[in-house]
Each structure stands twice: as C-alpha cells, then as structure tokens.
Regions:
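Short, flexible, mixed-charge acidic loops at enzyme active sites
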Residues: 117-128, 219-223, 400-411
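Bacterial N-terminal signal peptides
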Residues: 10-22
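Bacterial N-terminal signal peptides that target proteins for export
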Residues: 1-12
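Metal-dependent amide/peptide-bond hydrolase catalytic core
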Residues: 26-28, 253-442
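Histidine/acidic-residue-rich, glycine-tolerant segments that coordinate divalent metal ions
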Residues: 93, 128-139, 145-146, 158-280, ...
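Divalent metal-coordination and catalytic microenvironments
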Residues: 55, 94, 106, 144, ...
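Acidic/His- and Gly-rich active-site-bordering loop/insert found
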Residues: 28-140, 149-153, 157-166
C-alpha cells in the first residue's frame, strides 16, 4: 500500500458497492462491553508490543515472508485457531468456529518494502534481501507490522469475548500486497473454495491521522492500479553521429512529456487519473546512442472508463513517438493490477455508527478516497460486502502542528521515517476491528 493521507487527495468518489448485505442481526451496543474489551487490550499489550517490535525488526519482501507467516501461524495456533499455511505461496488462513452464524474475514498483509529505514528506533530494521537481482534494505515503512499486530490482538480479543458473538472467524494473512499480486495468488490457490467465501470482510490500514481516530469512505476508497512497461527500439550509433542512428532516448523522452497530454487534454478534468513514469533505463555510456530505451510506470484511476481512456492514450502516444522517429513499433505492455477498493455503503454506515458510539463522533472522520491502491479489492470483487478503513498513528498535537501554515509535514506511508506511535495505534486498531467484527456476528 501507499500513502493514504498525503496532501494529494482528490475529490470524494461517489461510487458505492452494489453487493446486497446478508441478513444482519441486531446492532451491537459497544458501551456495555467497552470495559471488558479495554481490559483485554490492556492485558495483552505488553506481549503484543514484543511481537510488534520483532515483526518490525525482521521484515520480509513479498512472497518471501516465511519467517513472518510462521510467527503469525504460531501465535494463532496458541489461541486455538485452525491454521493452514502456504496459501498463495506464503499466505495463511486461520479459522475459528463458534456456533452458527456468519463467516467474517479479517485481512492483514505480511510484506514489507525494499528500502532503508531511517527512524532511529531501537528496534529499527537492518534487514536486507534480494530485490530485482540486487541486495536491498527491507523495512515495514507502510505499517504492515502494525496491521499484523492489531490482527493478532483482534483475534485474541474476540476469543476473550466469544460468549458475545456467534459464527466463524476467517483470519487471512496475505502475502505481497505491495506488488498488488498477493490476494490474486491466494484466490488462485483456492482460498474461497477451500475455506468458503466469507459473508463479510474487514481490513484496516495505517495513515497519517491522529492516533485514537479512524477514517472512512462509503464507496471507492482507493484507486485502480495498473503498470506500464514500454520499450522503444532505435538504431545505435556514435553520440557524435546521431544521423547514423535512431535515438530511442529521444523517443522515450518525448513520450514521458507527451503522455501527460492524455491526462490534461483527453481525460475529464473532474475525474481522477494519473500516469507516472518512474523508471527510465537506456544506454551505458555518454557517447553512445543506444538501440533501445525502456520505461516503467504506474497508471491510477477510480473509474473504469477513465482507466480505459488512459490505456488507449498511452498506447497511441507510444506508437506515435516511434512512427515520428521512423523507428520500429515499440513493445507496449499495459499490465492490469488491482481494482479500486469499493466499500459497501450499508456496511460502512452500520460500522461507522458503532465507531462513533465507541470513539466519539469527532474521532470517526469521513475522508476522501486515496489515490494509492490496494489489492484487498480482489477479495471484495468475489462478491463479499466489505469495509476498509484508515487507522491514525500520530500524536494529535504533532498532527495539529503539521497542519499549520509552515508546519513540518509528518512522515507518511513509504517514508523511511514513518513510525507509528505503537501503543495508542495498536489499542485503537484492536478496539475498532473487534467491535466491527462483533457487530455483524450478533
């Protein structure tokens, strides 16, 4: 996942899920159970803090999360869950049956990012791993370590209050969310065929909000995510004799600029859409015109029609650059990634009402959809009413200071300095997720 609460939020999306909610029982009143839930959370926190620091110090990249998955599997078995490992390569599924009732899925991610941590924390990651053929630092700078710890804490809290809900818990630990391929891998491995399709699903994600708060969207919460991989073919020559060759660097450079015309002149300016070229690879020396140049980039959108228009424009622009240079047609790969996460409006409404009673109205905040992407949508798209919400991580005073004119922005997800405040973040994460699950299991 990527920064959910950056300053680049766009207009609120209005699309909403059309999935019909299964018949629900009475809504949960959180007030009578809050003291018991808080006692359970306070009691588990010291041990969960140790788990958090261990996960943070030992991150693993997507589809390499063997140690991480094994640790979560061990913890869930201690609680009495039936655990199956190796779903989607390194994913795991933990099941707990507690009478007749709905099946509710709670998702966490396992993977970290290929970057160096710079938080200075005593438990900061120093881990390294192979990434794209090179050694890279690895760190949990997207908050997945907190997601996993809250996931474990929620499981423990639910079992501590199992006399107050009925049904089946389906806790899913997903690999490789950062590449938006892990959910697909689990589904391809028969996740819902082997364990049944859940009636509801929930997931949370850390964001740069004050701790003690949560953010929500009723409808599209994240963007569609696709990638581009384009290779322009030229004809190599000496740098002093450009007329003897066909310069692919010039073609690729023109494309990087011209493709933005698809955004500014072809897409409805009121609709969100982004094309970003993040990697430009060509040549080996300054005095050689290479024979090819390769571009890698990302394509983001909310609506399917905008997505299609951008794909068409990208392909047309790339072909035009090559034709203008008298070069062969470029190799164009537009790779569909994840769809936008679209929260079920009815489930969001029910859950937000509960959150406001538990946390207070001012701490449950409607937010715009993120321009970032998430493959939680792959689970939702199987016909599962779901809610994906944001969990605040920072001292409210620091957030207020950062929002003032001239204030220093706080690090957001994917920053090497991203460091949630563990205790209040964990406690709010467990409280809200436990209540959300119980609210559909009455």
């Amino acid at each position: 996942m990527h920064p959910f609460l950056s300053r680049s939020f766009c207009a609120l999306a209005t699309a909403a899920s059309l999935i019909a909610l299964p018949t629900l029982g009475a809504e949960l009143d959180p007030q009578p159970i809050k003291p018991e839930l808080q006692r359970l959370i306070d009691q588990m926190y010291p041990s969960m803090r140790s788990v958090y620091e261990d996960l943070h110090a030992n991150p693993e990249l997507g589809f390499q999360e063997t140690r991480t998955a094994a640790k979560l599997a061990t913890e869930m078995r201690k609680l009495g869950f039936e655990v199956t490992e190796g779903i989607g390569k390194t994913g795991l599924v933990a099941i707990y049956r507690n009478g007749t009732g709905p099946t509710v899925m709670v998702r966490t991610e396992l993977d970290a990012l290929p970057m160096e941590e710079k938080t200075g924390l005593p438990y900061a990651s120093k881990a390294k791993a192979q990434y794209n053929g090179k050694e890279s630092f690895v760190t949990h700078s997207c908050g997945h370590d907190m997601h996993m710890t809250s996931w474990l804490g929620t499981a423990q809290a639910l079992l501590g209050m199992k006399d107050q809900w009925k049904g089946t818990l389906m806790f899913v630990a997903q690999p490789s969310e950062e590449t938006v391929t892990g959910a697909k891998a689990m589904l391809a491995d028969g996740l819902f065929k082997k364990f049944g399709k859940p009636d509801y699903a929930f997931a949370l994600h850390t964001g740069s909000m004050p701790y003690g708060t949560v953010g929500y969207v009723a409808g599209a919460a994240t963007s569609n995510s696709d990638s581009l991989d384009i290779t322009f073919h030229g004809r190599g020559s000496h740098g002093s004799m450009p007329d003897k060759g066909i310069d692919p660097v010039l073609m690729a450079s023109r494309f990087v600029v011209d493709v933005q015309g698809v955004i500014s002149r072809e897409k409805d300016p009121m609709e969100f859409g982004v094309v970003t070229v993040g990697a430009f690879n060509a040549g080996s020396a300054g005095n050689i015109i290479p024979d090819q140049a390769r571009l890698l980039g990302t394509i983001r959108s909310y609506k399917s029609e905008v997505r299609s228009k951008m794909h068409e424009g990208i392909e047309r622009t790339a072909k035009a650059e090559a034709a203008m240079a008298g070069a062969p047609a470029p190799e164009i790969k537009l790779i569909k990634g994840s769809d936008a996460v679209v929260n079920d409006a009815a489930l969001v409404g029910r859950t937000v009402k509960l959150f406001k009673t538990a946390l207070g109205d001012k701490n449950v905040i409607p937010i715009p959809p993120a321009t970032a992407s998430e493959d939680f949508s792959d689970f939702i798209n199987q016909g599962v009413p779901s809610m994906f919400y944001i969990l605040g991580v920072y001292d409210p005073k620091k957030v207020a200071e950062a929002s003032q004119p001239g204030g220093k922005p706080l690090p957001f997800n994917h920053s090497p300095f991203f460091a949630p405040d563990p205790e209040p973040t964990f406690k709010t994460g467990v409280q809200t997720m436990t209540l959300a699950v119980m609210n559909v299991m009455q």
